[in-house]
């Protein structure tokens, strides 16, 4: 019977307002989450991989004459020509530079041609007409496990596809050289024959080996613990801000609190918006320290804290404070709508652009653009550097720190300016309906 007292016009707002808001928010959620996971290889762009050619070349006998060859250079040139430039950022570097790029999380993997590649390929050609077991020359496809398991799979598939074509080209060339050598056998002498097994080996002369560069230790979760740690920090900041905002407002009398069937609504406290925000910020800072310590304790118990627990704790506190204070400033500026804004910025847009599961180079370009400033990506880079790259400043920790400080600065300035402005304009936290009744 109580529902009959609600005016029909208000029923429209009760039913359609949440329907419209949720349709918009959840449609955005569907687009972001399904778009970033639907076709990673089709979305590839600027995916960085190193190509290292250490081959020093060799002198081989071809048709009765010696010839200086460098099969490694031929393979490298074929790989450069065969890689789609719009998808792969192939960096031709030396082994030292490749190691540096791996350490600083600048590349997802590397294709390494060893120094004795030409020599071993020449031995394989000679050995094809004599007895005995001969090993095929090796090219190594290295993956960077700290960049995540999905990126390792992409590197492996790219390397295998490229090397299949190169293997065929080198096999045809090597087979032709062996046949030319056999054709130069002196008249009257019996020319050696290439056995069927040797022909198969010559057709695919390169053995491609997949290998992890510096495998992660136990507790790394195949490179996913950094992502989940970053997710924990973001969720603690967003949920923590929401809980603190609600509970502090309840204690100050700005909104009621329900405990099961009990309903409590304290009288409003005469306090400005600015000072209310300062109280919430202070509580958030204290909570951030406590939660970060609890996270570290849980991580230590589960063995996923890595080798840099102090750095992990300090960065967690910084990131959590930055996220929490930003969410508080949003709630102070937009009120209840700030909850949806925080959800959109930190979760809906943040998780797909984090690169914690699918690399940003394997997502649509608009998601990669979001990663330039989305908070979760910055936190993930810092966590990844601490857990997998020995807190290397250039591996993402530096960016994570500076972007967290920038976010903190924006939150402080924005929160102070907007609450001061509301207070200056006399926009106090009071019930407008009651105010109109009193005025009447």
Describe the predicted segments one by one.
Residues 233-241, 411-415:
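Hydrophobic core segments of alpha-helical transmembrane domains
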Residues 228, 272, 277-440:
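Membrane-spanning alpha-helical segments of multipass transporters and channels
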Residues 182-193, 264-268, 289-301:
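Hydrophobic, membrane-facing alpha-helical anchors
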Residues 1-219, 425-440:
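Extracytoplasmic/periplasmic domains immediately adjacent to an N-terminal transmembrane anchor
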Residues 217-237:
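N-terminal membrane-entry
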């Amino acid at each position: 019977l109580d529902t009959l007292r609600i005016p029909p016009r208000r029923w429209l707002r009760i039913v359609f307002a949440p329907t419209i808001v949720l349709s918009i928010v959840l449609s955005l959620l569907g687009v972001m989450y399904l778009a970033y996971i639907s076709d990673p290889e089709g979305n590839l762009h600027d995916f960085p991989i190193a190509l290292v050619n250490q081959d020093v070349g060799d002198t081989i006998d071809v048709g009765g004459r010696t010839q200086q060859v460098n099969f490694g250079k031929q393979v490298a040139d074929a790989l450069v020509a065969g890689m789609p430039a719009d998808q792969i950022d192939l960096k031709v570097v030396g082994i030292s530079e490749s190691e540096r790029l791996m350490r600083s999380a600048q590349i997802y993997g590397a294709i390494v041609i060893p120094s004795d590649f030409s020599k071993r390929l020449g031995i394989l050609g000679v050995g094809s007409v004599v007895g005995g077991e001969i090993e095929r020359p090796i090219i190594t496809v290295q993956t960077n496990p700290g960049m995540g398991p999905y990126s390792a799979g992409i590197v492996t598939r790219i390397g295998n596809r490229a090397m299949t074509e190169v293997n065929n080209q080198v096999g045809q060339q090597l087979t032709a050289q062996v046949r030319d050598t056999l054709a130069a056998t002196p008249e009257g002498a019996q020319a050696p024959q290439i056995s069927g097994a040797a022909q198969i080996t010559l057709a695919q002369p390169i053995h491609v080996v997949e290998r992890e560069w510096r495998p992660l230790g136990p507790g790394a979760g195949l490179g996913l613990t950094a992502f989940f740690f970053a997710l924990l920090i973001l969720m603690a900041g967003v949920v923590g801000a929401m809980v603190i905002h609600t509970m502090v407002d309840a204690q100050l009398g700005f909104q009621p609190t329900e405990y099961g069937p009990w309903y409590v609504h304290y009288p409003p406290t005469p306090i400005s918006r600015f000072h209310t925000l300062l109280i919430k910020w202070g509580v958030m800072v204290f909570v951030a320290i406590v939660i970060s310590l609890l996270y570290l304790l849980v991580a230590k118990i589960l063995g996923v804290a890595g080798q840099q627990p102090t750095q992990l704790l300090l960065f967690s506190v910084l990131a959590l404070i930055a996220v929490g204070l930003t969410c508080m400033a949003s709630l102070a500026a937009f009120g209840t709508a700030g909850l949806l804004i925080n959800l959109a910025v930190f979760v809906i847009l943040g998780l797909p652009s984090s690169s914690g599961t699918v690399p940003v180079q394997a997502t649509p370009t608009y998601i990669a653009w979001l990663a330039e400033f989305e908070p979760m990506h910055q936190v993930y880079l810092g966590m990844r550097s601490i857990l997998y790259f020995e807190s290397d400043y250039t591996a993402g920790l530096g960016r994570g720190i500076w972007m967290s400080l920038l976010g903190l600065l924006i939150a402080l300035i924005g929160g102070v300016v907007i609450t001061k402005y509301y207070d200056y304009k006399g926009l106090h936290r009071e019930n407008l309906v009651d105010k109109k009744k009193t005025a009447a």
